[in-house]
Regions:
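Positively charged, helix-rich recognition surfaces that bind polyanionic ligands
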Residues: 2-5, 13-184
Length: 184
């Protein structure tokens, strides 16, 4: 175990009644022995991302899978009298469903981002304006559920930790129309 300097400690309380101590520790990052590859990533709704090697990672859609249970628990909550103990118990049940979805999504994003960082030295991602894309009310739930921004943030901070390169390709760059071999 590495010895680092503890900057601060924060106690967090979740809506489900759990407490967590969050430690901010400063230490020197260890260089990761990655394979030195290069990869381009295109995120999507059906597939979470497709890479330039032809691999596709399916979108787990945790929110969609838990939607029935979430709707049922929220419906029960709406029928409880405000201020009652039963309403508070039901509020915790709704929060537990949300917490489970969040934990599943975070685990998936951490695993995928770490896998990409370990296998590749250079990762090219599209510079998407996710906030603007969320304005499309038909796609907003799917885009939010996929958590592209969080995934890009994880790739960015992990690349800084381990000395990898992240290249943000402009949205209008015709990358899919340019041959990677000859340039035409």
């Amino acid at each position: 175990m590495e010895v680092g300097k503890i900057n601060n400690v924060t106690i967090e309380h979740t809506p489900t009644g759990k407490y967590f101590a969050v430690l901010n520790i400063e230490f020197e990052p260890q260089p990761m022995n990655n394979k030195g590859g290069k990869i381009g990533i295109d995120v999507g709704i059906k597939e979470f991302y497709s890479d330039s090697n032809g691999n596709e990672v399916p979108n787990p859609k945790y929110l969609e899978k838990s939607m029935r249970k979430l709707m049922r628990e929220q419906r029960k909550l709406s029928r409880k009298e405000k201020g009652s103990k039963n309403r508070n118990k039901q509020r915790v049940k709704v929060a537990l469903v949300h917490e489970k979805i969040t934990n599943q999504r975070n685990d998936f994003l951490q695993n995928e981002s770490t896998k990409l960082i370990r296998e590749n030295q250079t990762i090219c991602i599209e510079d998407l304006k996710v906030k603007n894309m969320m304005r499309n009310h038909k796609m907003a739930q799917h885009i939010g559920s996929a958590s592209w921004s969080k995934f890009f943030d994880m790739l960015t901070y992990k690349s800084v930790w381990y000395g990898n390169d992240i290249v943000k390709v402009p949205t209008m760059y015709p990358s899919s129309q340019t041959c990677s071999c000859c340039g035409f």
